C-alpha cells in the first residue's frame, strides 16, 4: 500500500502518498507474442485502464506511449518490462501508478491530477483495482485467443482515445 521507489520511463519518479493511490504490478506470461509486437500489449493495458476509469467519469485519454490523462493532466502512468526468449516475450511485468485519493502533490511533476480532485469524493481503491485487473485480463485473454481480431479492435479503441490526436 506504499510505494517507496516508483519510477517511470527514462528514470522519472512517481510520487504516491501512502494509502491514497494505486501503485501495483501484475505479471503476464504471453505464449506467442513476439518482441516486435510488444506495443499491442501496451495498447491493451492502456485501454483497460482508461475503460476502468470511465466508470467514474469521462474525459480520459492515452498520451502515447504509456500515460493516462484526464483533460490536460496526468492521472496515471504505465510501465511494462518484458523478458525475452529468442524473439518471443515470455514474461511481462506491468506496473501502473494511478492517482486516486491524493489531494496534494509535492513533486516537480508539471500536471498531476487524482480522481478525488476530479470528482470531489473518495474512491474505493480496491473496487477500482478490481476493475482495472478484470479489464487487463479480458484484453490479455482476447490477445492470446484471437490475436489478429484483438489487435484490430484494440488499435481502433486506442486511436480513438489518443491524447491530442487532432
Q: What is the predicted function of each stretch?
A:
Residues 64, 69-70:
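Glycine- and Gly-Pro-enriched alpha-helical subdomains that act as flexible
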Residues 6:
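Phosphate/pyrophosphate-binding loops and the adjoining catalytic core of nucleotide-dependent enzymes
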Residues 31-59, 70-166:
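Long, positively charged amphipathic alpha-helical accessory segments at protein N-termini or as interdomain linkers
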Residues 2-3, 98:
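Active-site metal-binding loops of divalent metal-dependent hydrolases
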Residues 9-32, 41-42:
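DPxDG-like acidic metal-binding loop motif
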Residues 21, 66, 99-101:
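Asparagine-centered polar/low-complexity signal
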Amino acid at each position: 500500500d506504499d510505494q517507496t521507489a516508483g519510477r517511470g520511463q527514462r528514470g522519472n519518479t512517481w510520487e504516491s502518498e501512502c494509502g491514497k493511490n494505486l501503485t501495483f504490478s501484475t505479471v503476464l506470461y504471453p505464449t506467442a507474442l513476439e518482441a516486435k509486437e510488444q506495443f499491442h500489449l501496451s495498447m491493451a493495458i492502456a485501454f483497460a485502464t482508461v475503460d476502468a476509469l470511465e466508470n467514474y467519469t469521462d474525459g480520459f485519454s492515452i498520451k502515447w506511449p504509456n500515460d493516462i490523462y484526464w483533460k490536460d493532466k496526468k492521472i496515471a502512468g504505465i510501465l511494462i518490462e518484458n523478458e525475452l526468449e529468442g524473439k518471443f516475450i515470455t514474461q511481462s511485468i506491468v506496473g501502473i501508478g494511478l492517482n486516486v485519493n491524493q489531494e496534494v502533490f509535492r513533486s516537480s511533476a508539471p500536471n498531476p491530477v487524482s480522481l478525488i480532485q476530479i470528482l470531489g469524493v473518495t474512491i474505493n481503491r480496491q473496487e477500482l483495482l478490481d476493475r482495472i485487473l478484470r479489464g487487463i485480463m479480458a484484453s490479455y485473454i482476447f490477445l492470446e485467443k484471437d490475436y489478429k481480431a484483438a489487435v484490430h479492435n484494440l488499435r481502433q479503441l486506442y486511436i480513438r482515445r489518443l491524447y491530442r490526436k487532432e
